[in-house]
Swiss-Prot record:
Residues 1-17 form the signal peptide. This is Outer membrane lipoprotein MapA. GO terms for cellular component: cell outer membrane. It is a lipid-anchor. A lipid is attached at C18 (N-palmitoyl cysteine). PROSITE patterns: PROKAR_LIPOPROTEIN. A lipid is attached at C18 (S-diacylglycerol cysteine). Its main location: membrane.
Amino acid sequence: MFKKFLIFIVPILFLSACATKQDTFAQVNQISKNSQCSSCESPGGFEAKIKGLLYISDVGIQCCANKRTLDTGIALKKVYLHRFYDLKEGQKVLNAKGKKLFVDVNFNAVFYTYLKQELEARGIVVLDNNDQNSPYVSKIDLEFISYGATQDAIGLHSKLVGVLQVSDINKNKKFTIRTKQDVQGFDDLKETTFYTHLLIKQMANKAASLISEL
């Protein structure tokens, strides 16, 4: 399902999170439930208080239901999550006040989890495989292209870019997806994994919105 490319990198400080992966997913899902929903198709951006800090992003953490994509009169859309290519290890770096810290997150695996959640929330059927080779099942691929994160006196500033591909008998489309976040007052490096999850979830929200509209 996932393919990861490893490269040799210059030694940098290793940044590990105290919370387990399950704890991080649980935190993000709880934050999503507690957040006021917003349209993930809106260009207006999103602001909220998260863990006491002002969180600013270009897309909401919790998307409002889109009645058009949830219309029960329309045949169920089916997708197969095919391949998700992770960032190279040397790209997973947080520049924190002059220090380079390795962000220990499998971006592809985290994206898969959140994308599956978002697609199912939109009434889309997510298949474990396409063994029957149905030409009407949309194959979903994504490759992460770049990630940039900086901590300064104001807080944390992160950007993420990936290329989404959706293909079936009727279409073969590619979309470059960009998302960003600013966390004002961020100074606890142990929370880096949590905020990286939120950034990846934003990309999953955007990807799910694109897929649901095709």
